[in-house]
Amino acid sequence: METAPRERLRLVSSRQNAIVKQLRRSFSQGEVVEGYCAIEGLRMIEEAIRSGLKMRAICFSKSGEVKAERLLNQISHNVEALLLPDDVFSSAVETEHPQGVAALVKVRQSGPDELVSSSAPLILVAAGIQDPGNLGTMLRSAEAFDARGLILTEKTVSQWNAKVVRASAGSVFRVRTVAMRSPEMLEFLRGHKIQTAAAVARNGVRIQEFNFAGPTAVLIGNEGAGVPKELINRADHRICIPQAEPLESLNAGIAASIILYEATRQRSE
């Protein structure tokens, strides 16, 4: 006889419970802890399930217990299911207004070679992107426009930061991401004969006139300073998005989306 969803819930009242502590650490650090990242909210958890990610545990707040009926039917019985008092749940998550459900999901690790395994890969490089919303948008656009994946250089926010996960609308679970230092990244791309194009605000080749047909890596810099000068100087090309004066530049997420759209448009012709 099958167990009813709510009967699977185990009541835990201690903030020192191992799962509660791991959830808190992962949210507070914005990083993977022991191979798992913390995610919150019904939509994000269903995206993780849809993406085939494995879970260590799922936690419901007492006030969010009703969500168990919907979610536990989608999750293996091997996954621990905890019911937490509202104050214990709130102490573990990072949102100001907790959404009543959070989970520890096992992340997929991608290697650099996965980025170059197609004949003409299109790769996005996040060069020091610090705003979680921008990185989330870049991940979402990378999936939408069929980029091979993202390379995250030093000083880039973690893709497992809770705000990045939310902004990506689940794309972070499916898009390949690899962390590399800038010199290593350039050497890797050149070794695989992938042209590098640094996005600049002015004095670059207009993206409509640039040839994206071959293997290409597009470098997008952070919100304030743009692509670091040393990377611009070492990149094969400089590209820019035509825009009206006196606008100085677009934000990193929008710029990446426009460039990926143009690259995909050219490749589909």
Question: Model-found features: residue ranges?
Answer:
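Short acidic-hydrophobic, aromatic-tinged amphipathic segments that line or gate anion-handling sites
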Residues: 10-14, 80-85, 175-185
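Glycine/small-residue-rich loop that forms an oxyanion/phosphate-binding "nest" at active or ligand-binding sites
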Residues: 73-104
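Active-site/ligand-binding-proximal alpha/beta "capping" segment
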Residues: 197-247, 251
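Boundary-proximal intrinsically disordered activation/regulatory segments immediately upstream
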Residues: 1-70, 156-157
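RNA substrate-binding interface of SAM-dependent RNA methyltransferases
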Residues: 50, 109-110, 114-203
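Structured adenosyl-cofactor binding patch, chiefly the S-adenosyl-L-methionine
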Residues: 103, 141-145, 154, 159-171, ...
